[in-house]
């Protein structure tokens, strides 16, 4: 198609879109994705060998421009930010970064990336790598020597991390499994074989077959339920919410929901209605899962490298699954699609990857019974109804159910449920009584050891509490002895009081939880309630969060230093969104949250970002096999002196 005709068609599409609930942070449309790839392919890169698209997303517009455009004052509203896309492609063994101006149909910038690390793998690369061992003669011989049928073998490629190599290439290591009629592939490993693959050349570059172990029995490992599933009801007859484009309105909330190949669901420009002023007030500019880290605790040759950073290496959104009505989401849910770029740059539709629904919490959002009014018993309350935005990502053996839940009291509850199947290794042991060595896990079935591991989900939370100028306040609870002065009127010997400390720099913004009682608040020191309290939101963890137990000099820890603290607060920078660095695969720890925080920038009364790690140390148990019941984690962002009184009362 002629470039000028394409530009005209795109302009028409943009004008149409702007008239239908446009938002500057809307994900790229299929037309914008295809236009981007068309421009890249028509450039000098189109002539290079094996041009492959690894990242194609909206180039984040300037935050101040977005906020001005969203201003309710028409006289201050500038033109919408220009739509631009950011692209990462591989061609001829090199990584290229481009910014495409979708209005002018021109490349605004282009450079070759020469730093450490590589972009995420495409599903085509992963598929080819999974099939490669099956055609490799030494592997075929190993399977034959084990008297196995190669048609029943499945291989799964894993990322390899970084372990001090001075030069690296794009590699995967494939582990293989023997189905033999079983659908629970991960429970039947063919132990002892490791296949190392050069992804760019798609060739086996190293092969080892070190030992053999009996393959675990397939009997009893089926994860499919034998019970008829109960329908998923919420007892909320009406939807109660409106979705206008990517904008969602419900009760006293309005926000923008998006979907990207890397982060999956994103929540932006979330504002809550003040019942006194009848105006919406800002709470969060941007929120999404930034990175995951799943290191396994087996240092042996076949396992040591399994330290996955799934979002940067594979993509949370790209791994999102089609949500199943009445299983993943209730009958009153609205389902939303996402669009991502395929390896060839063309738009791919991902159907029903998000759902939005009202949830009945089967409890009270508030209640009270008063018996001290003469002759009366007065009871009042309100049922807990909230709004949930949900997605599910399946990354290999694990499924992550991610919820953003908005409450009428002004709180945002962020939850993640871990489920799926364990990653196991084969063993000759059939009883725990036989084990006399460190097996780095738990015997969960005969010949089956589930390996110890961690899960960390790092959330990016660009909170704008009533504006951009925010601070981190640590409200520390301190025990105080009753003084001699008070002893004349009190029999008490002690009490606790609150001592508030405001973090000055990013070093102060690195916080460990659990040792001393403290509440963490993001406040706006420039805004106060009618009676003079500083407005804010506080962080409420749902359980004691795990932090990394790896030593600082261990290579996985160098790459994932952001897991050393559950809470980080940094100065806002538009380019700092991915906790493990943008190029996670084979990264060396020279980019990412820990590096940014080490700059020790000022964070008092600044535009700041909170990062929160939902962390688990997972010691496997037999009840986790053959499929793991959901394990919940999360946190709540709750208004704290943000309103003049309880917003549920008004």
UniProtKB/Swiss-Prot annotation:
Which cofactors, if any, are listed as required?
L-topaquinone; Cu cation; Zn(2+); Mn(2+)
User: Could you tell me in which tissues this protein is expressed?
Assistant: Expressed in the vascular tissues at the division/differentiation transition zone.
Specify the protein name.
Primary amine oxidase 1
Q: Which InterPro entries match?
A: Cu_Am_ox_TPQ-bd (IPR049948), Cu_amine_oxidase (IPR000269), Cu_amine_oxidase_C (IPR015798), Cu_amine_oxidase_C_sf (IPR036460), Cu_amine_oxidase_N-reg (IPR016182), Cu_amine_oxidase_N2 (IPR015800), Cu_amine_oxidase_N3 (IPR015802)
Q: Residues that bind substrate, according to the entry?
A: 308-319, 395-400
Query: What's one Pfam family the UniProt record gives for this protein?
Result: Cu_amine_oxidN3
Entry binding sites for Cu cation:
453, 455, 618
Instruction: Classify the main location.
Output: secreted
> Catalytic residues?
310 (proton acceptor), 398 (schiff-base intermediate with substrate)
User: What is the scientific name of the source organism?
Assistant: Arabidopsis thaliana (Mouse-ear cress)
MF terms (GO), sorted A to Z: copper ion binding; primary methylamine oxidase activity; quinone binding
């Amino acid at each position: 198609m002629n470039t000028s005709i394409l530009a005209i068609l795109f302009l028409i599409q943009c004008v149409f879109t702007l008239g239908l609930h446009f938002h500057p942070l809307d994900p790229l449309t299929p037309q914008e994705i295809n236009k981007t790839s068309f421009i890249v392919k028509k450039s000098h890169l189109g002539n290079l060998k094996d041009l492959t698209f690894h990242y194609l997303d909206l180039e984040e517009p300037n935050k101040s421009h977005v906020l001005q455009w969203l201003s309710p004052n028409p006289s201050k509203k500038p033109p919408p930010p220009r739509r631009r896309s950011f692209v990462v492609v591989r061609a001829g063994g090199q990584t290229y970064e481009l910014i495409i101006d979708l209005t002018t149909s021109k490349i605004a910038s282009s450079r070759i990336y020469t730093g450490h690390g590589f972009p995420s793998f495409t599903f085509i690369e992963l598929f080819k790598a999974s099939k490669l061992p099956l055609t490799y003669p030494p592997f075929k011989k190993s399977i034959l020597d084990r008297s196995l049928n190669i048609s029943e073998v499945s291989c799964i490629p894993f990322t390899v991390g970084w372990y001090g190599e001075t030069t690296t290439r794009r590699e995967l290591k494939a582990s293989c499994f023997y189905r033999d009629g079983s659908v629970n592939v991960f429970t039947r490993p063919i132990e002892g074989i490791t296949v190392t693959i050069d992804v760019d050349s798609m060739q086996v570059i190293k092969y080892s077959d070190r030992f053999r172990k009996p393959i675990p029995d397939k009997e009893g490992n089926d994860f499919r339920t034998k019970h008829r599933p109960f329908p998923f009801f919420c007892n909320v007859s009406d939807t109660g919410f409106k979705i206008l484009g990517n904008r969602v309105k419900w009760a006293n909330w309005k926000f923008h929901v998006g979907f990207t190949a890397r982060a999956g669901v994103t929540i932006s420009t979330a504002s809550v209605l003040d019942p006194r002023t009848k105006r919406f007030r800002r709470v969060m500019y941007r929120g999404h899962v930034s990175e995951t880290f799943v290191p396994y605790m087996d240092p042996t040759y076949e396992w040591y490298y399994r330290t996955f950073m799934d979002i940067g290496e594979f993509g949370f959104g790209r791994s999102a699954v089609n949500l199943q009505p009445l299983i993943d989401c209730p009958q009153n849910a609205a389902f939303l699609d996402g669009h991502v770029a395929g390896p060839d740059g063309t738009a791919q539709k991902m159907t029903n990857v998000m759902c939005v629904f009202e949830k009945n919490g089967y409890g009270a959002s508030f209640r009270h019974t008063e018996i001290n009014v003469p002759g009366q018993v007065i009871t009042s309350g309100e049922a807990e109804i909230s709004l949930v935005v949900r997605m599910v990502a399946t990354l290999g053996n694990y499924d992550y159910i991610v919820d953003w839940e908005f409450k009428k009291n002004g709180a945002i509850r962020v939850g993640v449920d871990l489920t799926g199947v364990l990653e196991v290794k084969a063993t000759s042991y059939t009883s725990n009584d036989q084990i006399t060595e460190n097996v780095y896990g738990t015997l969960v079935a005969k010949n089956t050891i589930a390996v110890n591991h961690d899960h960390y989900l790092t959330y990016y939370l660009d909170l704008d509490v009533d504006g951009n100028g925010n601070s981190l306040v640590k409200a520390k609870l301190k025990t105080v002895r009753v003084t001699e002065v008070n002893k004349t009127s009190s029999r008490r010997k002690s009490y606790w009081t609150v001592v508030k400390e405001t973090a000055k720099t990013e070093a102060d913004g690195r916080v460990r939880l659990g040792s001393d009682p403290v509440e963490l608040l993001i406040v706006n020191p420039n805004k106060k309630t009618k009676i003079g309290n500083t407005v804010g939101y506080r962080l409420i963890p749902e359980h004691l969060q795990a932090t990394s137990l790896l030593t600082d000099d261990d290579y996985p820890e160098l790459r994932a230093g952001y897991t050393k603290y559950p809470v980080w607060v940094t100065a806002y920078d538009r380019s700092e969104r991915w906790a493990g660095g943008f190029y996670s695969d084979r990264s060396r720890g020279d980019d990412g949250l820990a590096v940014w925080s080490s700059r020790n920038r000022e964070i008092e009364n600044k535009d700041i970002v909170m990062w929160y790690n939902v962390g688990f140390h997972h010691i496997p148990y037999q009840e986790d096999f053959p499929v793991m019941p959901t394990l919940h984690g999360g946190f709540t962002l709750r208004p704290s002196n943000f309103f003049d009184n309880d917003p549920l009362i008004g």
